């Protein structure tokens, strides 16, 4: 549980729980799996605006590559008081030698507007993502 925790003037609240689900294989070639749950998550800015979220994710770490794969979903209320959901439809993958997500698809569904689909690509270590909103596609460099 976060208490009196701030980052650059933003107050962060909530309860984060990690549960180790298990390890398979050997230390040289194995897989860790754990669940991460956020309850009552809230970030409040210096001007007292805030957003909230709750999430459940499953994280898998593969050895020896330290490739990390994440699945799951979240929901909350944005800065304007509108509900949203986030669903990882294709696992988000991070590789040890890359600073960005290298593959996976994330869907963001804010209330009252079209769903946003964020595609991180096919595994190449680059800064490129594609964002699709309705029939419009945007190529974005992170």
Residue ranges and their predicted role:
Residues 12, 84, 115-116, 138-140:
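Short, isolated positions in well-ordered beta-strands
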Residues 130-142:
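Short, low-complexity, Pro/Ser/Thr/Gly-rich segments in the mature regions of secreted, periplasmic
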Residues 1-3, 34-43, 72-76, 105-108, ...:
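Short polybasic amphipathic segments
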Residues 8-95:
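Short helix-loop boundary/capping segments
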Residues 90-127:
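C-terminal structured interaction module
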Residues 28, 78-80, 98, 110, ...:
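A generic structural signal for short, solvent-exposed coil/turn residues
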């Amino acid at each position: 549980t976060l208490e009196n925790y701030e980052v650059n003037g933003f107050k962060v609240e909530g309860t984060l729980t990690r549960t180790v689900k298990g390890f398979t294989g050997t230390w040289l070639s194995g897989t860790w799996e754990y669940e991460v749950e956020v309850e009552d998550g809230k970030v409040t800015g210096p001007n007292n605006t805030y957003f909230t979220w709750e999430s459940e994710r499953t994280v898998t770490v593969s050895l020896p590559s330290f490739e990390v794969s994440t699945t799951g979903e979240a929901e909350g209320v944005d800065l304007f008081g509108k509900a949203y959901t986030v669903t990882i439809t294709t696992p988000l993958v991070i590789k040890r030698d890359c600073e960005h997500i290298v593959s996976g698809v994330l869907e963001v569904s804010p209330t009252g507007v079209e769903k946003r689909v964020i595609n991180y690509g096919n595994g190449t270590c680059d800064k490129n993502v594609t964002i699709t909103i309705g029939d419009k596609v945007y190529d974005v460099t992170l």
